[in-house]
């Protein structure tokens, strides 16, 4: 794949991002003064961090709400997991925090009894909370029970109580932050516009650099969902995602947002205002066999808000033993959405064992090329697997160097006007599953019948306007 810069038209000046200097990660840029800590916790404050997070209850009708924002568990005994991912990046100190939550087989809220194992075969159950934070350090807390987990059927709202105040009952829905702090000693709650919690490492992950505790509280203003800002937001995997057809399904819930608040991490307090943020989720009977992933919404110097999400994997389709290797690139820029998916074009990838991610795509109107690298060793993260439960299954870093180039497509298929040429050194990069004996190179090859079905414009939400008729999660 040739990722050299194409010669632009003489009259066109591409919008180019500027890479942040490779300074020490904890080195605060000039003009940033750490605040005095109120206790033994040291403090970092972003240059603009003056505002405190403001809690607002989640409104019923959000303009940027995507399909599949809700919790998809249908109450049946089929194998099931759901996972959520929320990322906040602080460009001023080149640090990111990635919050990951998962629930496995929630039908068995107290774990599986001997009778359950006899009737349904042994399965892994429970709720996990992971954070990949500053300096790629890690924390994880897990419980085999999900009786204190809750999720909204139709909105991006969920929470869990690992340890409650003995004088209070665990919340079973969104509550004001003061109420949460009073009732929950260890746990979390998150909505599209509010996120808070406190977790304690349970000692299961001593194979990576970890921290003992993390506490956070921040509000978020969504900027992009998944689609044009002024249009109805889209299902990432098409309308078939409303049914248990793919294993797993995937949805970007917020391609970009601006978050304000604070995170306490390993004895250091990070305060921020309007920090770039992101959220996505997946659900189904099991994780892909193998996958790769790129996400970045920190592009200094680029005009307007820019967000990139690109990924692919080997996943199961239907009830048989059939697998496909779909791949996707989605770009939000200046309010517009540029989508490269199998049902509208082609996507190619060239992924190394670790350290190199190359992707390109084309649709009827545009061409895109992505190259990302990292010299970091990466951190092993956990994923809910059918075979072993929540175990190390992927490797991530938030210190990827990335270049994103987007062109208009000429009538002959060649590159036309360059729309965007942006760079970053804060890309989140991941490879997972396996085995990864070698690199992985290919072009989207999907089942043609499935491709035609997925590409059919069907608005499932409009077909089922009454909430209780909608499938869970939609």
UniProtKB/Swiss-Prot annotation:
Molecular-function annotations in GO: isomerase activity; tocopherol cyclase activity
Compartment list: Plastid, Chloroplast
The gene coding this protein: SXD1
Pfam family, one: Tocopherol_cycl
Pathway(s) of this molecule: Cofactor biosynthesis; tocopherol biosynthesis
Major location (coarse): plastid
Tissue localization of expression: Present in all green tissues, both in bundle sheath and in mesophyll cells.
Record key words, sorted: Chloroplast, Isomerase, Plastid, Transit peptide
EC class of the enzyme, as a word: isomerase
Entry's EC annotation: 5.5.1.24
Chain's role: Involved in the synthesis of tocopherols (vitamin E), which presumably protect photosynthetic complexes from oxidative stress. Catalyzes the conversion of 2,3-dimethyl-5-phytyl-1,4-hydroquinone (DMPQ) to gamma-tocopherol.
GO cellular component, one term: plastoglobule
Catalytic activity: gamma-tocopherol = 2,3-dimethyl-6-phytylbenzene-1,4-diol
Name of the protein described by the UniProt record: Tocopherol cyclase, chloroplastic
Transit peptide: 1-65
BP terms from Gene Ontology: chlorophyll metabolic process; fatty acid metabolic process; phloem sucrose loading; regulation of defense response; response to high light intensity; response to oxidative stress; response to temperature stimulus; vitamin E biosynthetic process
Signal sequence bounds: none
